[in-house]
Amino acid sequence: LLQLSDIEVSFLSRNSISRHGLTTNLDKSKKLSSSNCKIKLNKKLFEEKYFLYAEFVLFHEYIHSLGNFSHDKNFRQLENLWPEKKQMNIIGRQLTRELQEIKAQWAWTCSKCGFVVKRSSRKFRSNYFHKECLGKLKNIPIIRPTSLEH
């Protein structure tokens, strides 16, 4: 475990929405190991409300750095050693939703019930529908106030 203290930890790019952590090789020509890896974390994890979840994400990335690359049965057994892992999954989904909300530039709005799904991409087909009420979805740009409008 002493090897883990030598692993470089930095931030993910600002545009990361669904990724909360990433373990990469320092030297791509060599196999990933605790001596040849770097861990990147989403900056949002350093907000006080996400501190406990940040510890879990770091634990998850440390499992990768110890040679468990895929999310297979062995990886999940190690990850399940974390106390209250189910709660961490809930917090992770909340963080993803918050990041989506911040980055959203488009909203898919249901014409029948008014349900809204915010999206960062404009990709849209006219035949999309809301699975709950079967209303047709419309793609609407989100207009954010500029700094001059404040």
Can you describe what each PLM-predicted range is?
Residues 1-48, 52, 69-150:
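Metalloprotease/metallohydrolase-associated module, dominated by Zn2+-dependent proteases
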Residues 56-68:
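Active-site recognition of the HExxH zinc-binding catalytic motif
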